[in-house]
Amino acid sequence: MTDKITIQWLSADGMVRGEADGEQSATLRPAEYAPGDRLCFSGARYLWVRVAEGVKESMVFLPEGGFTYPIPQDEQAIQGFAPGTFAGAQTVTARRAERSEISAYRNLALNPADRRLAEEVVDPDAPEWSNPTNSEAVAGGLVECFPHAYANRVTRNEGCFYARNAIDGLSNKGGHGVYPFHSWGGAVHKDLSLTVYFGRAVTVDKIILHLRSDYGLNDKGQEHDTYWNVAILEFSDGSEVEIHPEKTGDPQEFPFAPRETTFLKFKRMDPVQVETSLNFAALNEIEVWGTDNNSL
């Protein structure tokens, strides 16, 4: 017998404000959220989750069969969402993933419900290569929901540049800043590193990059953005792949030999630096395509 799919709406002090469950799916419609409110999802290791009507549904992997989602409410956390996403009554859904969906070839990096944990906040102005390139939250078993993105730098620690923005399924060309132009960015540092953790072994064979492309000119005739023309991808088996992105906001596909891995890391990212640009390189979205190795 399988567990029921359950969604709970909890207050800051743990009081249950609302709850819904079902054998295969659950739908809850919380009223206005209060500070500190959170949603708790449980019932399966693979769930299709939608945390708000304005957020894409995605399949997530839950090692312990559940996860808690604090409602984004502070000034930084909401910058990667459309205004009003978590205001007023919202329909929240969860459904059990079917075997065929779990085993399907798909984008394994998609998770609009991803979030930055407190243990992952780093100094945006630290000396080069001094910030950790691995997530201490993942290492400490604190991440409940995968895929999960982590970066060793976030520009000014602003929410519109969080690593989670690169796996939320949204990509808009020609701008930068808050939604809908949110991205992952680490300013103009040369030691930037981004990792997508899958939480279990998967087999991957290509990535699709959506580079940020704010190429509008300022009053000095300079473009805001540049791009990485060399990047080294590292996998948990120790293998590496070198790719060469181009200057475009269109999706760029990079296939490689299939490999089993628990993460994909941008180990090195070399930006093109020219006088006609402010030389900010950033990522709107990364897709990592492959299959799940679990037989569930």
Specify the residue positions occupied by each region the protein language model found.
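Disordered, acidic Ser/Thr/Pro-rich linker "stalks" and the adjacent N-terminal cap
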Residues: 1-197, 212, 217-223, 294-296
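Short proline/glycine-enriched turn/loop motifs at strand-loop junctions of beta-rich domains
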Residues: 33-34, 44, 202, 226-228, ...
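Trp- and acidic/polar-enriched beta-sheet ligand-binding modules for extracellular glycan
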Residues: 188-193, 214-296
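Hydrophobic loop/turn residues within beta-sheet-rich immunoglobulin-like superfamily modules
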Residues: 198-201, 257-259
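Contiguous beta-strand segments within globular domains
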Residues: 204-206
